[in-house]
Amino acid sequence: MQEKLLLELMKACTPSAIKWLKEKKEEYEHFCSNKLLPSVTSQYKKLNVSTSMLFRNQGYEIDHLYVPLTLHHEHKLEKKIVRVDQYPSDIFDLSRKVLICDSAGMGKSTLLKMIYRYAIDDIAQIPFYIDLKSLIHNEKVESVEDHLLRTFPSFNETPSKGLFTQLLEHNKYLFLFDGADEVADKYKEEVFRSVNVFSDKAKSSSIVVATREEDLILSSFYDFRLFKIKNLTKDCAFALLRKYEFKDCVAENLIDEIENNANKTIEEFLKNPLLTTLLYTAYSYSRQVPLKKSLFYKQVYHALYENHDATKQGFNFSC
């Protein structure tokens, strides 16, 4: 990612503050070149590396494994369907505050990380990705602003600290808050309150919170537009499987077996990105399509156990 691209992004996202920034040209240039741009660049690269236990220490890049997911919102007379294969500006048509809520394994975190990339690649908005668990520091909940200043220590130096606060008030950024359901229960209310207070301050920015469904979370973000992730189609699931051709495990062989063994359990697996990936993991271990859930999870367990041992020195395993 080139600095020129980020500078263009900065310019595109700050039209409302151009006059104000002209008066602070020196500080603005200092902030862009020495503070914000390096931070965004670093996060852009870091978020693209998969941290999934399925690809332990393999360095697989998320944008190479990603199959476009589709968000949908339905409420009374409102309806919106958005395929996320570029920056999804349409999800903010109804509100600048969005809640992405779905079950485990539907790809919420991956989706947020891809939206981060698209925001930069499409020169749409300057993004910030925040794991909500990280707002808990030294057993206390900190404000989003304090978290950003702590996470990016260089922001604390003048003129960056004051300028950051001013830019937050004047400009349109994108804040992606991940894992609301993963926050420890005793901190949840305070963490969610911190996000809402911040959202009110960053009046021009777009806010996205991703979570599994919980009553407390839904009520805490009641004024956010709720989006869910559509199930994968069979074609999308097969496209995902084809991206997971590791070692000598050919995805087409698995796909052929799935097509030849109609089974409701397998069809259910294919609707969920994580279960689709685990299906490949199970198949890579046994070369058999698990037609029962018990067999499926047993094969996954053994495959991951072998994968763990394969990282140890002297282990020799051929898939």
Task: Describe the predicted segments one by one.
Residues 2-56, 60-63, 70-314:
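P-loop NTPase signaling cores
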